[in-house]
Amino acid sequence: DVPPIIAALISTEDVRYRGHSGIDLMSLVRVGVKTVLMQNTSQGGGSTITQQLAKNLFPRDTARNRSRVARTAKLVTSKFKEWITALKLEYNYTKEEIAAMYLNTVEFGSNAYGIKSAAHTFFNKEPHELNIQEAALLAGLVKGPTMYSPRRNPENALARRNLVLDRMASA
């Protein structure tokens, strides 16, 4: 039986999580087409949970005083490092271990980093005590901890939680 927080995370952040080895080629192609053909350079949408973990473990250098070419080169280099790290993580750990590591490193907002801190901050519970609605709310925070904060933006938090619940039901 998959804990609700894991089910919520996978259904929202990486629906093909169990079927790839750290890099989701279908998502990469989709993002590539969106970026190149449609000239849509909005960030996000192609990283797997494993890639997001790699990024959390080894943050990018975000210096802003570089030229556009230098920033692009740095982004490409960091993406390749992220992919290699994701493949190594998948080789050395189980999917359950990777999901747990991710949940223990991600920001949930309100100064809560990691699922244990988030469960205590928002619900005064241990992670294993979360019900499906609470797990869905926390999983929804990952995309935008401030935008979907139940404290700052309760309407957004509720709508995001409901989206996560819908995705869980569809999975």
Q: What is each model feature region?
A:
Residues 1-171:
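Peptidoglycan glycan-strand catalytic modules in the bacterial/periplasmic cell-wall system
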